[in-house]
């Protein structure tokens, strides 16, 4: 379990998760982070003043992620739960990644996808942390087919769904309305969905309602905010971020660093606890006879942590 950005609420929600009875019963946890984060459930850490050095915080966040991945690839731990990081601080600290998902994919040389999941809804993002102006160029038949493959494998391996029902959310209003509002849905998304063997594309204003009613096991959203809005409206505070495609389970809470309330004992640990318990359930599933440690038969060298790209 990484503490995330030590200036934020990460250390607090980690400490609260460690103190949770369910977590204590189900998990043995190694905390990875700077000693100064003061994680303790047995004694007071006394008075402290959070650092304002964003670059240092980002550097420490990145080092913790690197170390956690090394431990997971070596088999020292069964999975990783990550507390929130500050993306700008991560970059200032020398790590040229938009966030956890991309960094984890690079470190493990894996093709990954971001899933947000709750007991009501599962959403996978076909594109993640890019400007809206770049979404159309980033969406390709290959990227959608790959997102569907990773989603299908994740639903089978981690959630135990033998025949996953996956749908693709449309890009344009009303799915383009026969080309009146754009041709991408008919010319790109529909052929890609057919090639991937998934349903859709269906308009965003109905697809998530259908998924909430149980028609689909997961929805692939074409861009970040349409998917994030749906999951957070449905399950704010209880959803879990999952990186699909890694050779080990990785989860995190569905919120950010909340720098404005750090150190005030106001942080709600619910999502962190949910992330920890879900990671534990994935790890237990992988240990069962026939369980899989990850997603496919990648070469042996892909199991060794790669050195991440650094910002200049």
Model-predicted segments: where are they?
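Ligand-binding beta-strand-loop-alpha-helix segment within the catalytic cores
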Residues: 116-146
């Amino acid at each position: 379990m990484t503490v995330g950005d030590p200036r934020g609420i990460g250390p607090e929600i980690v400490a609260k998760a460690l103190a949770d009875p369910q977590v204590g019963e189900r998990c043995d946890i190694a905390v990875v982070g700077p000693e100064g984060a003061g994680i303790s459930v047995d004694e007071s850490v006394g008075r402290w003043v959070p650092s304002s050095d964003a670059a240092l915080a980002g550097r420490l966040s990145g080092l913790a992620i690197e170390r956690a991945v090394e431990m997971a690839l070596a088999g020292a731990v069964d999975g990783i739960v990550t507390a929130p990081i500050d993306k700008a601080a991560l970059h200032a600290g020398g790590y040229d990644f938009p966030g956890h998902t991309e960094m984890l994919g690079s470190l493990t040389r894996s093709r990954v996808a971001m899933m947000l999941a709750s007991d009501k809804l599962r959403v996978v993002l076909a594109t993640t942390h890019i400007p809206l102006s770049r979404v159309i160029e980033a969406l390709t038949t290959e990227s959608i087919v790959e997102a569907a493959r990773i989603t299908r494998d994740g639903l089978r391996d981690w959630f135990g769904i033998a025949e996953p029902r996956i749908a693709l959310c449309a890009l344009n209003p009303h799915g383009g309305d026969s080309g009146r509002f754009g041709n991408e849905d008919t010319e790109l998304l529909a052929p890609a969905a057919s090639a991937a063997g998934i349903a859709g594309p269906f308009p965003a204003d109905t697809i998530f309602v259908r998924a909430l009613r149980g028609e689909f096991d997961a929805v692939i959203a074409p861009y970040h905010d349409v998917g994030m809005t749906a999951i957070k409206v449905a399950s704010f505070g209880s959803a879990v971020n999952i990186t699909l495609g890694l050779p080990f389970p990785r989860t995190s809470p569905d919120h950010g660093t909340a720098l404005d309330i750090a150190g005030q004992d106001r942080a709600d640990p619910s999502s962190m606890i949910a992330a920890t318990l879900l990671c534990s359930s994935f790890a237990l599933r992988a240990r069962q006879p026939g369980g899989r440690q990850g997603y496919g038969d990648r070469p042996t060298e892909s199991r060794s942590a790669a050195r991440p790209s650094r910002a200049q």
